Amino acid sequence: MNGYGSPYLYMGGPVSQPPRAPLQRTPKCARCRNHGVLSWLKGHKRYCRFKDCTCEKCILIIERQRVMAAQVALRRQQANESLESLIPDSLRALPGPPPPGDAAAAAPQPPPTSQPSQPPPPQRPAAELAAAAALRWATEPQPGALQAQLAKPDLTEERLGDGSSADNTETFSDKDTDQRSSPDVVKSKGCFTPESPEVVSVDEGGYAVQKNGGTSESRPDSPKYHGEQNHLLIEGPSGTVSLPFSLKANRPPLEVLKKIFPNQKPTVLELILKGCGGDLVSAVEVLLSSRSSASAADRT
């Protein structure tokens, strides 16, 4: 741009200037150069006065630009094909890398053909294991044996969750009766893990047992079993969690947290659930760990 505010520099006669170091070449407009005008190419294409010129020199420039664009496209295609030929077929079948920030990005993805044996997970506290097992038992559908019993007309899912029933009885097989007659504590089918010794031993329905059509009687070998209350008491070093049996699998996780932790504020439970990514078991573990830390601070 000259002193008069025009972006064009008209070529004149040679002007004597002192010699200086050669600078980096600045791109110029070829069409303006054909017509004796020197103009910088940056931001000039839309405003070039000769952009619609159809003289022989400008037509030659157009053809040359088309040839250069075709050559660049061909070179890019050849470069992509050469890169694809270098990659083996085994690497092409692998999935792409996970997005940054994902928690699973830290663990390497094993190949789909080989499945190496994974090391056993570290042991967690007994209260966390008990809460996780109880939540899985309450939220997941029951196994086939329990589903066959639930299919009977005299014992429905609503009757299991209803506390107003007078008898609260349930029919069991001879195998369960033999296990119940043993002096050992009866193990829970869906909630027992070897790492959690404090898991409560409760049957599927949590009700009294009717043997040989007689009167219902509660089990004396399970101290944490209550026939009058439809709740599962989970006791551990961090406290006791009361889990109602009437929880259904279609309940939202926030409602389940409100039932398990009635003393906590709903807003706090919602924030913890969002922080755990909607995982109900992780949220219960966080709440139990916070409760254990608070009790330890009170003792000190």
Swiss-Prot record:
Residues 108-124 have a biased composition (Pro residues). GO terms for biological process: adult locomotory behavior; regulation of DNA-templated transcription; sex differentiation; transmission of nerve impulse; ventral spinal cord interneuron specification. GO terms for cellular component: nucleus. Residues 29-76 bind DNA. Expressed in the spinal cord, in a small population of neurons located in the ventral horn and around the central canal. PROSITE patterns: DM_1, DM_2. Residues 251-286 form the DMA domain. Gene3D superfamilies: DM DNA-binding domain. SMART domains: DM. One of its GO terms (molecular function) is metal ion binding. Pfam families: DM, DMA. Residues 89-129, 157-226 are annotated as: Disordered. Keywords: Developmental protein, Differentiation, DNA-binding, Metal-binding, Nucleus, Sexual differentiation, Transcription, Transcription regulation, Zinc. Residues 172-181 have a biased composition (Basic and acidic residues). The keyword Disulfide bond does not apply. Belongs to the DMRT family. Probable transcription factor that plays a role in configuring the spinal circuits controlling stride in vertebrates. Involved in neuronal specification within a specific subdivision of spinal cord neurons and in the development of a coordinated locomotor network controlling limb movements. May regulate transcription during sexual development. DMRT3 is a marker for a subset of spinal cord neurons (dI6). This is Doublesex and mab-3 related transcription factor 3, truncated. The gene is DMRT3.
